[in-house]
């Protein structure tokens, strides 16, 4: 009797292993530490970096610099916590954000706390990146060929999506590492172009650093929206465990060591991308800067066209980094819950449908700036600023009023404030601009 039972559980284990070897997050575990560096850069340095001077113009110098630097420190701290908690259970790896959530809050509750937020972030980012990709392609076309007949954004988004209908079928994180590396290099390049071209232009003769809005109400709401933009700029946490899952781990060399090395490199790159763009862009253009600094810099045309093309390449990589965990969730549900056979056909259909879905939403709702502030506070703040801290308090139980305890509560309070305040600003921006928005523009 024992033998057959034994074999039944072995069969189950073998089946589980087969599924794990097939799923995108867990299938390949041979990443080097520098993979984690450029995956993290690609995930974190969003096209959001180009809206930082605009955010600065709504925050002003004092609050602006404070919030930028503070966000950088807090998010680095919460990222460190996640890297540490990846192997908090000896001999087991928490490969996905929701697995860590389930370990901290229990099977059911953990899923319900993490998965909806993670999906809002990942699908939200992918939709925003569809819009960004399409808009940047359109901009390149306008710059390179100013006399051509204008092509609607809708078609540019479709052209951008066509790339993803192909590369979404790469099986896992390691197979997109070349794309991700290219994307990380691009984000550095266009950030550098953005601030270097600003410096080259020189400070505007009548530069003005007073708040952009004329009314007090406007100032407050713009401030809140800018908070969302900055919070959104540091949001690589949704994919950090999934990236760490690709790194091999042994008792002598746990995965957190190479992962942390990669994260540090990534954060230095993030600082090199963000701070010069935000501060120099604001210093030079003051409150006349557009919500995408590349629009403010019209000349030299070839350089700005190139920068926009780099944005496109970067966004291709970012889209994939954020789509991979979604593919993983979809495929897990289909194979484990609905007992589909893990096959290429299944993968081909689910991923194509996902790309089509993000494309259609992007085409219907191409308003970029307002959505960022709204989603930023709503889903990014929790997953980036305070969920890791709450999990840390639950799992590590630091001493009350000790350094760790205080730091975590500080992050939680800041994060909760962001969650409440940023969407208010974002929503108002959406409402004000909605009058001029056209669906299917």
UniProtKB/Swiss-Prot annotation:
Example GO BP: amino acid transport
Subcellular location(s) of the protein: Cell membrane
pH sensitivity of activity: Optimum pH is 4-5.
Record flagged with keyword Transmembrane helix: yes
Pfam families, per database record: Aa_trans
Entry's transmembrane regions: 33-53, 59-79, 111-131, 153-173, 176-196, 223-243, 264-284, 301-321, 348-370, 374-396, 407-427
Domain of life: Eukaryota
Recorded GO MF terms: symporter activity
InterPro entries: AA_transpt_TM
Cytoplasmic side: 1-32, 80-110, 174-175, 244-263, 322-347, 397-406
Record entry for activity regulation: Inhibited by diethylstibestrol (DES), 2,4-dinitrophenol (DNP) and carbonlycyanide m-chlorophenylhydrazone (CCCP).
Known tissue expression: Expressed in flower buds and to lower levels in leaves and stems. Not detected in roots and siliques. Restricted to the tapetum cell layer.
Keyword annotations: Amino-acid transport, Cell membrane, Membrane, Symport, Transmembrane, Transmembrane helix, Transport
Topology Extracellular: residue spans: 54-58, 132-152, 197-222, 285-300, 371-373, 428-441
Membrane topology: Multi-pass membrane protein
Keyword Hydrolase: no
One cellular-component annotation, GO: plasma membrane
Family: Belongs to the amino acid/polyamine transporter 2 family. Amino acid/auxin permease (AAAP) (TC 2.A.18.2) subfamily.
PANTHER family membership: OS05G0424000 PROTEIN-RELATED
Function: Amino acid-proton symporter. Transporter with a broad specificity for neutral and acidic amino acids. Basic amino acids are only marginally transported. Involved in import of amino acids into the tapetum cells for synthesis of compounds important for microspore structure.
Designated name of the protein: Lysine histidine transporter 2
Gene field: LHT2
């Amino acid at each position: 009797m024992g033998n057959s039972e034994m074999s039944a559980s072995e069969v189950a284990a073998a089946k589980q292993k087969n599924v794990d070897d097939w799923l995108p997050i867990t299938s390949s575990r041979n990443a080097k530490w520098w993979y984690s560096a450029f995956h993290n850069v690609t995930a974190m340095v969003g096209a959001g970096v180009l809206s930082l001077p605009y955010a600065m113009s709504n925050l002003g110098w004092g609050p602006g610099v404070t919030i930028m630097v503070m966000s950088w420190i807090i998010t680095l701290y919460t990222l460190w916590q996640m890297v540490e908690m990846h192997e908090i259970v000896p001999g087991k790896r928490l490969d996905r954000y929701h697995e860590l959530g389930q370990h901290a809050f229990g099977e059911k509750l953990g899923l319900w706390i993490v998965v909806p937020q993670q999906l809002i972030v990942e699908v939200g980012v992918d939709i925003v990146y569809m819009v960004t990709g399409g808009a940047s392609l359109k901009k390149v076309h306008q710059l390179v060929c100013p006399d051509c007949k204008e092509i609607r954004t809708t078609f540019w988004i479709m052209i951008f999506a066509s790339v993803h209908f192909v590369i979404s079928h790469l099986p896992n994180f390691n197979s997109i590492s070349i794309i991700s590396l290219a994307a990380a290099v691009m984000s550095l390049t266009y950030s550098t172009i953005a601030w270097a071209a600003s410096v080259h232009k020189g400070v505007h003769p009548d530069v003005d650093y007073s708040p952009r809005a004329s009314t007090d109400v406007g100032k407050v709401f713009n401030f809140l929206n800018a908070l969302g933009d900055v919070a959104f700029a540091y949001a690589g946490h949704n994919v950090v465990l999934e990236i760490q899952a690709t790194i091999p781990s042994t008792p002598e060399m746990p995965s957190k060591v190479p992962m942390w090395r990669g994260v540090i490199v990534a954060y230095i790159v993030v600082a090199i991308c963000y701070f010069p763009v935000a501060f120099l862009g604001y210093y030079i253009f003051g409150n006349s800067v557009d919500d995408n600094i590349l629009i403010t810099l019209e000349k030299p045309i070839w350089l700005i066209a190139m920068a926009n093309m780099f944005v496109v390449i970067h966004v291709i990589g970012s889209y994939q980094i954020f789509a991979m965990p979604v593919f993983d969730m979809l495929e897990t549900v289909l194979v484990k819950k609905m007992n589909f056979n893990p096959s290429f056909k299944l993968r081909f259909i689910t991923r194509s449908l996902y790309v089509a879905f993000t494309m259609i939403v992007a085409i219907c709702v191409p308003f970029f700036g307002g959505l960022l502030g709204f989603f930023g506070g709503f889903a990014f703040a929790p997953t980036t600023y305070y969920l890791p801290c709450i999990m840390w308090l639950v799992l590590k139980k630091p001493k009350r009023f000790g350094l760790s305890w205080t730091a975590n509560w500080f992050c939680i309070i800041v994060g909760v404030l962001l969650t409440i305040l940023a969407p208010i600003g974002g929503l108002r921006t959406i409402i004000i601009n909605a009058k001029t928005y056209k669906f299917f523009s």
